[in-house]
Amino acid sequence: WNWEHYGQYLDTLEELKPSLNVAGLVGHSAVRYYVMGDRSFDQQATEAEKQQMADIVEKAMKDGAVGFSTNRYEPHKAPDGRAIPGTYAECSELVEIAKVVGPRDGLMQLVGADAEVMKSIAETEGSRVLFSYGCSGEEGSGTKAATHLDEMNLEGRNITATSHTRGSGYMFGLQSGLPVEGLTWDELRAKDFAGRLEAINDETFCNALVAEAREPKSCGIPLQKVYFLGFDEAPEHNSAQNLIELSKCAGEHWSETFLRLSRESKGRGLFNWRMFAGNLKEQGDLFARENLIPGLGDVGAHVSQIMDGGWSSFMLSHYVRETGVFTLPEAIKRMTADPAAVIGLKDRGVLKTGMKADINVFSPDEVTELQPELVNDFPGDAPRYIQKSRGFKATIVNGQVNVLDGEPTKVRAGQVLRH
């Protein structure tokens, strides 16, 4: 690394000449560890340390951060297994930081914070809050969650939620992760893709795989929440039958269904554990609220487990073209002008003279996301998912064509957007 402070980090990003425009939030974990060292994991900050953190965040804002982010979601761990710094920080620590973010029209972004913490922050110096949200998927849960969001915004609070557009959580299949622990499955796991495909076409080997999958506790995934993404060009995110139901209909053990669908798709078939946004009808009811924007998803994290890059294409295909939850202008506003306003970008988000020319040209009748696929192009040939789309003619970044007919050009016209 060639940076210490946040502004130097943004300088480094500029030197990389990004293809897209990027903006950043200064992270709580890094700031807390910088101030408190190893104590940052499980101890509370002193008043002096809280002030030091606020000073660092204030400098980051002056150097271009659009806000501050914190994560209170316990399953997010450091390499040694401890919850990341900031997970258990007192609310007063976040309030102290909000005192320097709010007056600069910065954004306080939270993951895993309860409603009272968010209200306290939103009531500090006029702070704007963005947080990750969703609904359980049970009947009526979308409307219930939307009403709760309305209640959080009472008394002048400015709290915006963001949520997935379709089921997400963990994707697996023959080309990526395998769902069973066992010696034969470990043998399959050790093979490359061609070797795996050959192995699952061997009857004796498959019988051994199924026998291990029948063992109690061989699979830790809740299979009643796992859905096959189908054989079509576009992934099927609205299928009603989970993997257990598919196997019962076929008179098979679920592992037999997994292996059969893998063979029939020539190993390319993927299975999606819908941890979040498993019910699209309820998600649509949640999206009815103006203070909720679509877009929560992993693209650059969990790169061999999740691929949410197609969420915006799905927004246009499912919620506009197929179900009519949104009109086309409404959906575009939700994905452009609204997020720009939440982030605090005043020079983009609408097609208007004098605004930045960040434009997508697409066919509303054709736009759709395509099936994710695994490639090995990371350092050391490490794997990651990629995902393409159909129906986009061009993506224009700062007036220059960045993507044409679905393929990147050599233009790298992106900028680091500073607050």
Language-model-derived ranges and their functions:
Residues 72, 112, 133-135, 163-165, ...:
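Active-site proximal loops enriched in glycine and acidic residues that flank catalytic Cys/His/Asp
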